[in-house]
């Protein structure tokens, strides 16, 4: 039997999935479900039968989002359900629905916002074909958000095996990769940093993808040592637009075919509305959406650029605009640092005082003084945190990113 999903010790085949899809003429428009298999069954059933979906986090509370009738959550809806003869027929049905999927932003810096997509937008970057059919994917994202959906579609549309590693410990992740001979994985930089330190290498992994946050050279080097046979790439995707760019080193390239769909205004990336889902929260300048991402050109003629920061993350320190990502990047260069978060704390004189929380690699004896001495060599004084606090862990959003508010 061809394997579909391994989740918390339970394994499911595509044969079982087909039976689950055919056994009922009901599905859930609004579904809160912790069980990943049941979540995927409902997702596939809706799409294969051209029914709309609103994807909700299992731990969602009604104060977090607007526009959802709580009384309708987990209430079954009857549909005209197709009986499928095999999984290939299901895949074909999922390719062409006209129904809409409503998802919510991760809430990294504020209240989650609703965005409505068609399936074609969500599957814009999915690749099909013989070369993809034997891949084994480590599933390292929340399934209700953009990145999780895109990894799911890439695996499912090629009938690949998915191994759930989301919210697992470092030792559990490595055991699952080794036991199931994982070949592909996609996750946030925060997820990969949580895999450090490492004790051995994993030869079966062929491709590692990062997305959702800024990364750094030190992390790329660590990933290259853990997975020596893997190609490493970075992608730019958003809840609003889906996948748009792939990276070349630390730079992203706007494809020539859609270069006219982007503008740069005051260093901010603007995206044409034709590439977006639908949302009442979008802020447009004519036909272009303000992404909130600040960039710098590497080669404007070739469409190559680097991300600098999120516009709403810049911190006013005594009249200077500080990019916390720049300071974090330097802190992460220091041997013994696993993760770092830089933020502003309100101050009546300076506007904000720059602060940092630092998580050390297990066994590290790094001191605050050593961190400060290194930062003094690399950064201007106003970019150096006045307060540095050592922490054991960081709060994460539902999508696995560090929470910044």
Segments from the language model and where they lie:
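Conserved pre-ATP/AMP-binding loop-to-beta segment of ANL
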Residues: 3, 82-104, 131-137
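Conserved AMP-binding/adenylation subdomain of ANL enzymes
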Residues: 123-136, 144-184
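AMP-binding/adenylate-forming catalytic domain of the ANL superfamily
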Residues: 380-401
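Conserved AMP-binding A3 loop
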Residues: 99-127
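Conserved AMP-binding/adenylate-forming
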Residues: 20-60, 139-142
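Gly/Ser/Thr-rich phosphate-binding loop
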Residues: 196-252
């Amino acid at each position: 039997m061809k394997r579909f999903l391994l989740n918390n010790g339970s394994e499911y085949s595509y044969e079982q999935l087909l039976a689950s899809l055919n056994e009922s003429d009901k599905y859930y428009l609004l579904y809160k479900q912790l069980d990943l298999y049941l979540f995927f069954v409902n997702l596939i059933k809706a799409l294969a039968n051209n029914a709309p979906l609103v994807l909700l986090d299992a731990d969602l509370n009604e104060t977090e989002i607007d526009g959802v009738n709580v009384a309708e959550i987990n209430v079954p809806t009857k549909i005209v359900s197709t009986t499928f003869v095999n999984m290939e027929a299901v895949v074909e049905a999922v390719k062409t629905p006209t129904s809409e999927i409503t998802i919510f932003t991760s809430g990294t810096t504020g209240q989650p916002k609703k965005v409505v997509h068609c399936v074609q937008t969500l599957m814009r970057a999915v690749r099909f074909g013989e070369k993809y059919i034997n891949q084994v994917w480590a599933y390292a994202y929340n399934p209700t958000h953009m990145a999780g959906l895109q990894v799911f579609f890439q695996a499912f549309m090629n009938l690949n095996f998915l191994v759930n590693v989301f919210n697992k410990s470092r030792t559990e992740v490595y055991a699952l990769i080794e036991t199931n001979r994982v070949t592909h994985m996609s996750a946030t930089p925060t997820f990969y940093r949580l895999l450090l330190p490492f004790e051995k290498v994993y030869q079966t992994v062929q491709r590692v993808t990062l997305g959702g946050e800024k990364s750094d050279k030190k992390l790329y080097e660590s990933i290259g040592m853990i997975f020596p046979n893997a190609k490493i790439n970075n992608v730019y995707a958003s809840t609003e637009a889906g996948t748009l760019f792939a990276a070349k080193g630390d730079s992203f390239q706007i494809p020539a075919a859609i270069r006219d769909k982007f503008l740069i205004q005051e260093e901010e990336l603007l995206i044409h509305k034709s590439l977006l889902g639908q949302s009442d929260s979008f802020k447009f300048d004519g036909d272009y959406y303000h992404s909130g991402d600040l960039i710098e050109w590497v080669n404007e003629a070739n469409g190559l650029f680097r991300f600098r920061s999120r516009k709403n993350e810049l911190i006013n320190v005594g009249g200077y605009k500080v990019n916390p990502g720049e300071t974090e990047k330097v802190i992460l260069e220091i041997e013994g640092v696993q993760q770092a978060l830089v933020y502003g704390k309100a101050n009546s004189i300076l506007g904000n005082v720059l602060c940092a929380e630092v998580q050390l690699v297990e066994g590290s004896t790094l001191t605050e003084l050593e961190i400060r001495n290194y930062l003094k060599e690399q950064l201007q004084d106003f970019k150096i945190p006045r307060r540095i606090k050592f922490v054991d862990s960081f709060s994460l959003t539902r999508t696995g990113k560090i929470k910044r508010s």
